[in-house]
Amino acid sequence: MSECIGMLLAGGEGKRLGMLTKQGAKPAVPFGGKYRIIDFTLSNCTNSGIQTVGILTQYAPLELNKHIGNGKPWDMNHQHGGVSILPPYTGTKGGDWYSGTADAIYQNMNFIHQYEPEYVLIISGDHIYQMDYQQMLEQHKRTNADVTISVIEVPWAEAGRFGILHANDEQIIYEFEEKPKNPSSNLASMGIYIFNWKTLKKYLIEDANKPNSSRDFGKDIIPSMLNNQHRLYAFKFNGYWKDVGTIQSYWEANMDVLKDNNGYFSLHDRNWRIYTHDSNLPPHFIGTNGKAVNSYINSGSIIYGHIKNSIVFRNVSVQQGSYINQSIIHPNVKIGKDCVLDRVIVMENTTIPEGTIFRSDKEIEPFIINNEILNSMLAPAGGDV
């Protein structure tokens, strides 16, 4: 029996990320020089002592499944518990594609039953943050809550993207609305919930039998529990948290990790490590005329050009005379001589010809570059975009 197990929602397509999710799910998108987005939530589980995690996949899961494997990088390759990948399935008693966040959990109730947990932690694999779930669980138990929702204040201009709630001084939630057109609060749900399992199970079964339900926690389960006067509490989070659901927010979050003080978030915190697969490549190399300033350069990369305020993943080569600024360079990219890349995102396995210039204006979201785009836009000898 486990006191609390985690259910990690990782099946999102992430349409707003455009080309970045054309071949794989959003949680598998590279981030921060050596990681994938899902590494942050999985590492939170490891660091919080959550030893059993079910990962619910759906859209284009191949790269994500390969990355997670048996969970060893996160110390989750246990004989009992550990990490389990839970794709949609069909069986003699139903099953289908997940039609919503609540439906994904409903279809995997048998998995949860194996561990007979008292509490279930529902988390998402597409946010960047460092959080101790044990602190949230302690509050949940202390307040005798039926569900605890982790919340954070967001800019008013972005409030309509989230579930918005009101809570009193005791953090009791008395109003909740999913993605309102005219938000009355900027206190947003982070999509992190702790439920009493017996209560959640009851509501999942009831919701599955409602023909007009959207099978969603924010649209259906939480409002139903609130209407039935269950004890809903807010857990206020004051650290760094970023929903990287758009190209702009993805670029901003990567740039944030380069800042000395970005709101209590650091890849160098030895007490809260971010775990991932090690590529076993040699150290990066910066040549005689190469230069890197305020940048992450990952293993296997060879730099002869100038890198500034940028994130460079593994096995990237940058030739002499090239200048890269405020950009994200994914793994296995080759950049020729005398190129300029300013505020762009270069996808994995892209080859950029000599003399190519890409600049994104600050007024628009950063360009995404891959071989397909290059072939359609540039002449063989390179060009200026």
UniProtKB/Swiss-Prot annotation:
CDD domains on file: ADP_Glucose_PP, LbH_G1P_AT_C
Coiled-coil ranges (or none): none
Catalytically driven reaction(s): alpha-D-glucose 1-phosphate + ATP + H(+) = ADP-alpha-D-glucose + diphosphate
Binding site for alpha-D-glucose 1-phosphate: Y98, G163, E178, K179, S189
Keyword Nucleotide-binding: yes
Superkingdom of the source species: Bacteria
Catalytic class of the enzyme: transferase
BP GO terms, sorted: glycogen biosynthetic process
Entry EC no(s): 2.7.7.27
Transmembrane segments: none
PROSITE patterns reported for this sequence: ADP_GLC_PYROPHOSPH_1 (PS00808), ADP_GLC_PYROPHOSPH_2 (PS00809), ADP_GLC_PYROPHOSPH_3 (PS00810)
Keyword rRNA-binding: no
Keywords attached to this entry: ATP-binding, Carbohydrate metabolism, Glycogen biosynthesis, Glycogen metabolism, Nucleotide-binding, Nucleotidyltransferase, Transferase
MF (Gene Ontology): ATP binding; glucose-1-phosphate adenylyltransferase activity
Pathway connected to this protein: Glycan biosynthesis; glycogen biosynthesis
Protein function: Involved in the biosynthesis of ADP-glucose, a building block required for the elongation reactions to produce glycogen. Catalyzes the reaction between ATP and alpha-D-glucose 1-phosphate (G1P) to produce pyrophosphate and ADP-Glc.
PANTHER family according to UniProt: GLUCOSE-1-PHOSPHATE ADENYLYLTRANSFERASE (PTHR43523:SF2), GLUCOSE-1-PHOSPHATE ADENYLYLTRANSFERASE-RELATED (PTHR43523)
Subunit structure: Homotetramer.
Protein family (similarity comment): Belongs to the bacterial/plant glucose-1-phosphate adenylyltransferase family.
Name this polypeptide is given: Glucose-1-phosphate adenylyltransferase
Gene: glgC
